[in-house]
């Protein structure tokens, strides 16, 4: 991150013109590809459709907390759990469970 020496606000890179630009006061400073590369991060937003479902990519579930709940598939009484906001912000979050024995995943709307 780079801050404007005039007003102290965050400066953003304009890669086409190869300058740092302050959107508050208009100050510009040359962009040095070698020196400034590690100060910039390209952010890419991934949008999901509501019907796509939730996929757990990280398989190291041993770091997740566990709770006593019966798995509807195998009857095991322990599951990993995590909470996510899957609906509108003014609605309660969704709790997901994954059985420690068979790996079945289900959800609970709180």
From Swiss-Prot:
GO terms for biological process: DNA-templated transcription; regulation of DNA-templated transcription. Keywords: DNA-binding, DNA-directed RNA polymerase, Metal-binding, Transcription, Transcription regulation, Zinc, Zinc-finger. SUPFAM superfamilies: Zinc beta-ribbon. PROSITE patterns: RNA_POL_M_15KD, ZF_TFIIS_1, ZF_TFIIS_2. A zinc finger (C4-type) spans 4-25. Zn(2+) 2 binds at residues 71, 74, 99, 102. Zn(2+) 1 binds at residues 4, 7, 22, 25. Signal peptide: none annotated. GO terms for molecular function: DNA binding; DNA-directed RNA polymerase activity; zinc ion binding. InterPro entries: DNA-dir_RNA_pol-M_15_CS, Rpa12/Rpb9/Rpc10/TFS, TFS, Zn_ribbon_RPB9, Znf_TFIIS. Pfam families: Zn_ribbon_RPB9, Zn_ribbon_TFIIS. A zinc finger (TFIIS-type) spans 67-107. The keyword Transcription regulation applies. GO terms for cellular component: DNA-directed RNA polymerase complex. Induces RNA cleavage activity in the RNA polymerase. In its presence, the cleavage activity of the RNA polymerase truncates the RNA back to position +15 in a stepwise manner by releasing mainly dinucleotides from the 3'-end of the nascent RNA. The truncated RNAs are able to continue elongation. Involved in transcriptional proofreading and fidelity. Misincorporation of nucleotides during elongation of transcription leads to arrested elongation complexes which are rescued by TFS-promoted removal of a dinucleotide from the 3'-end. Belongs to the archaeal RpoM/eukaryotic RPA12/RPB9/RPC11 RNA polymerase family. This is Transcription factor S. It comes from Thermococcus celer. The gene is tfs.
């Amino acid at each position: 991150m780079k801050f404007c020496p005039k007003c102290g606000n965050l400066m953003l890179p304009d890669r086409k013109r190869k300058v740092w630009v302050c959107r508050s006061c208009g100050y510009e400073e040359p962009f040095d590809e070698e020196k400034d590369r590690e100060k910039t991060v390209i952010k890419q937003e991934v949008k999901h459709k509501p019907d796509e479902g939730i996929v757990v990519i990280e398989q190291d579930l041993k770091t997740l907390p566990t709770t006593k709940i019966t798995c509807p598939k195998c009857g095991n009484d322990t599951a990993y759990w995590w909470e996510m906001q899957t609906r509108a912000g003014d609605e309660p979050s969704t709790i997901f469970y994954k059985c420690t024995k068979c790996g079945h995943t289900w959800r609970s709307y709180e």
